[in-house]
Amino acid sequence: MMKLKSNQTRTYDGDGYKKRAACLCFRSESEEEVLLVSSSRHPDRWIVPGGGMEPEEEPSVAAVREVCEEAGVKGTLGRLVGIFENQERKHRTYVYVLIVTEVLEDWEDSVNIGRKREWFKIEEAVKVLQYHKPVQASYFEALRQGYSANNGTPVLPTTYSSSMSGIR
């Protein structure tokens, strides 16, 4: 299913969830520092860069496109961390690891909406996300637990609050 938004087409899965993709953008392979971007709705809050998938777009391709648009970085795409479900907002987000190899000085969202970006230690990133973006904070828990993907489907517990199923 698709819906047109003013400047984009939203895509939905069979359950009516918006299909999204995002990356945990790490400064290096040690995965100690992650890049967060300012929210377009709440510029004083930090979020993981990501967004809606285009029709017929593979999740990995969408993830790379979104981080370039939102965070102004390019890099080496790594493993799928998981597919995360936000029942409140009806989103399913494919989250990947990306090792940053190039940081653009000017990028689409910095020019168009004044979006900012900043490197955070993992613990700090979790702290700034857990209040207003608990599902995004859970990305790091899944990463830390190090569950491996089973044919692209992560094998992870669903032990998050009732307003979100956490990880599918």
UniProtKB/Swiss-Prot annotation:
It catalyses: diphospho-myo-inositol polyphosphate + H2O = myo-inositol polyphosphate + phosphate; 5-diphospho-1D-myo-inositol 1,2,3,4,6-pentakisphosphate + H2O = 1D-myo-inositol hexakisphosphate + phosphate + H(+); 3,5-bis(diphospho)-1D-myo-inositol 1,2,4,6-tetrakisphosphate + H2O = 3-diphospho-1D-myo-inositol 1,2,4,5,6-pentakisphosphate + phosphate + 2 H(+); [phosphate](n+1) + n H2O = (n+1) phosphate + n H(+). It holds the Pfam family NUDIX. GO terms for cellular component: cytoplasm; cytosol; glutamatergic synapse; nucleus; synapse. Mg(2+) 3 binds at E66. Residues 17-142 form the Nudix hydrolase domain. Its cofactor is Mg(2+); Mn(2+); Zn(2+). Mg(2+) 2 binds at E66. Its main location: cytoplasm. It is found in: Cytoplasm; Nucleus. It is an enzyme of class 3 (hydrolase). One of its GO terms (molecular function) is manganese ion binding. One of its GO terms (biological process) is RNA decapping. A motif (Nudix box) lies at residues 51-72. The modification N-acetylmethionine is found at M1. SUPFAM superfamilies: Nudix. The active site is at E69 (proton acceptor). InterPro entries: DDP-like_NUDIX, NUDIX_hydrolase-like_dom_sf, NUDIX_hydrolase_CS, NUDIX_hydrolase_dom. Diphosphoinositol polyphosphate phosphohydrolase is inhibited by fluoride and InsP6. Binds 3 Mg(2+) ions per subunit. Substrate binds at R10, K18, K19, R20, S39, S40, R41, R89, K90, H91, R115, K133. Mg(2+) 1 binds at G50, E70. Belongs to the Nudix hydrolase family. DIPP subfamily. Cleaves a beta-phosphate from the diphosphate groups in PP-InsP5 (diphosphoinositol pentakisphosphate) and [PP]2-InsP4 (bisdiphosphoinositol tetrakisphosphate), suggesting that it may play a role in signal transduction. InsP6 (inositol hexakisphosphate) is not a substrate. Acts as a negative regulator of the ERK1/2 pathway. Also able to catalyze the hydrolysis of dinucleoside oligophosphates, with diadenosine 5',5'''-P1,P6-hexaphosphate (Ap6A) and diadenosine 5',5'''- P1,P5-pentaphosphate (Ap5A) being the preferred substrates. Monomer. This is Diphosphoinositol polyphosphate phosphohydrolase 1.
